[in-house]
């Protein structure tokens, strides 16, 4: 019974891949196609009722290159509507800033808890860049995209969880993705292990679709990170 109660508690929070309370997070990533590393530092807070906010700062490093700033980002979300104890509708949004310019996104999550050990979140998101880029016709325009994401959350044990996360992107204006088409996929597999009430390390394997130039290969990425809850 104790294990079942723990699973129920974990299920109530794993839908957004977070636990309640303030936390700091560190993550390192390596892209095998570009030979690029990314270092991320994040601070955040998640309330017991599901609302949250987080601040993110990243840096990138490539072989024989200097450490460069990636982006700063602030993101927040709120469980606006909960018609049943299994269904939650949650809007969210973010703004970011990097060397080329700023941008942001708005999204709507719909989460349904099918069982104590499985829940699914479907996310509809619009990504916007405030700066202009040169499109396929040689004109300046905003390289915005529409994104559909799914989060298949599985509670394996009271400590171990797994999330399967496929995302589909479609470019709104006349731009191609790195695979040479107007659309692409990004698929993430996340494995988490809850050591205790403070430490939550995780490991991610990602496929970021094929890059047709300049790398001409599949973009696979490995991430290793940990959260510390206060």
Curated annotation (Swiss-Prot):
Please classify the protein's predominant subcellular localization into one broad category.
Answer: membrane
Specify the signal sequence span: 1-20
GO BP of this protein: monoatomic ion transport; oligosaccharide transport
Give the top-rank taxon of the lineage listed in the UniProt record for this protein. Answer: Bacteria
Question: What kind of membrane protein is this, topologically?
Answer: Multi-pass membrane protein
Q: Where are the transmembrane segments?
A: none
Give a Gene Ontology cellular component term annotated to this protein: cell outer membrane
Places the protein is found? Cell outer membrane
Q: Which UniProt keywords apply?
A: Cell outer membrane, Ion transport, Membrane, Porin, Signal, Sugar transport, Transmembrane, Transmembrane beta strand, Transport
Give this protein's Gene Ontology molecular function annotations.
porin activity
Query: Which InterPro entries does the record associate with it?
Result: Bact_OM_Channel_sf (IPR053713), Oligogalacturonate-sp_porin (IPR009331)
Pfam families, per the entry? KdgM
Would you identify the family this protein belongs to, as annotated? Belongs to the oligogalacturonate-specific porin KdgM (TC 1.B.35) family. OmpL subfamily.
Q: What does this protein do?
A: Outer membrane channel protein that allows an efficient diffusion of low-molecular-weight solutes such as small sugars and tetraglycine. However, the specific substrate recognized by the OmpL channel is unknown.
| PANTHER family in the cross-refs | N-ACETYLNEURAMINIC ACID OUTER MEMBRANE CHANNEL PROTEIN NANC-RELATED, OUTER MEMBRANE PROTEIN-RELATED-RELATED
Instruction: List the protein's name.
Output: Porin OmpL
Organism in which the protein naturally occurs:
Salmonella paratyphi A (strain ATCC 9150 / SARB42)
């Amino acid at each position: 019974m104790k294990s079942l109660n723990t699973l129920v508690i974990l299920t109530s929070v794993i839908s957004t891949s977070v636990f309640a309370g303030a936390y700091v997070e560190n993550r390192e990533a390596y892209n095998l196609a570009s030979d690029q590393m990314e270092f991320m530092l994040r601070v955040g807070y998640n309330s017991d009722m599901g609302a949250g906010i987080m601040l993110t700062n990243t840096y990138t490093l490539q072989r024989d290159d200097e450490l460069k700033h990636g982006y700063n980002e602030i993101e927040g979300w709120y469980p606006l509507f909960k018609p049943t104890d299994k269904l939650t509708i949650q809007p969210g949004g973010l703004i970011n800033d990097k060397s080329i310019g700023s941008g942001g996104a708005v999204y709507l999550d719909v989460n349904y808890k099918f069982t104590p050990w499985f829940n699914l979140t479907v996310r509809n998101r619009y990504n916007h860049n405030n700066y202009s880029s040169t499109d396929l016709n040689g004109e300046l325009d905003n390289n915005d995209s529409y994104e559909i994401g799914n989060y298949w959350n599985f509670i394996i044990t009271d400590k171990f969880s797994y999330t399967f996360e496929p995302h589909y992107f479609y470019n709104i204006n006349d731009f191609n993705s790195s695979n040479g088409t107007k659309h692409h996929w990004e698929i993430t597999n996340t494995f988490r292990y809850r050591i205790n009430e403070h430490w939550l390390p995780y490991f991610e394997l990602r496929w970021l679709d094929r890059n047709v130039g300049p790398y001409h290969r599949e973009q696979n990425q490995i991430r290793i990170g940990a959260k510390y809850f206060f």
